[in-house]
Amino acid sequence: YILKSIYKNMTQNCSCGKHCITTKENMAGKIAELNPCENCEDVAIKKFSPLNELIDFNELDSDYKKCKCGKRPIDIVMSHVLKIMIEEEIIPQNATLRRHSPVPLPCFYYSTQMAQFIGKDSLVLIHPDFNKKVAKRLTDEVDEVKGVLKGNPQEVNGMIDKDSHIKNFELLSGCCNRSDVMRTLIKNNDEMEKIIINKDQHKYHIEVAPTTGEKLIKLHNYLENSNIKKGTAIDGMCGNGSIGIYLLKYGFEKVIFNDVY
């Protein structure tokens, strides 16, 4: 009942006014969008070489190396991002993709690998030295960037304990709503159930979806091997609640979601 109520009240419209929210109905279309078209051509950029020695910055705009389907190789997109960061002097002139890139978070995640060709509004970027001027340029000039966050991805968001202050990333520009889709081993009508987590990333610590997926597989195997089919469970320090949602789908009658934040 709880899960049905959540899905019933969920709309496909994000607070930004766009269709950022992933639902059971639009998930298949978003998964299909991850695939490149037959004309997408991969371009690999040397990660440890200064970017300004590899690409003419005068040519590097939103149309540079863009396929007719509207997608570009991820290396080209990140090169475009790095160019703007260099021009705004928040990283050195000899910056490289490996050492100076912000963390790119896919707005829609489904699989163990990041899509190599991405289209409009596909990324949320995070870097500790971003400012509003840089952020505006990134969302205005790089089509693939949907949102820009200021913060250290190595730090934990929210509250570490009950006495600590709430810590969030700062949303500087755009929208930071993201969706993670995780596969499970729960079978329903000949299909494996999937768990969809939609979140405004500035409020949450960065959690790697494959790691969460591995946790769900280990939990499933433990429950199956222990012949546990139902019961009451506590998802302590639940964060986004992936494990608790999984237990409800698995058949548990009651799950307590608990987190200090």
Describe each PLM feature range:
Residues 80, 133-134, 218:
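Exposed alpha-helical structural elements
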Residues 128-209:
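Non-catalytic substrate-recognition/targeting regions of SAM-dependent transferases
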Residues 217-261:
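Conserved SAM/SAH cofactor-binding pocket of Class I
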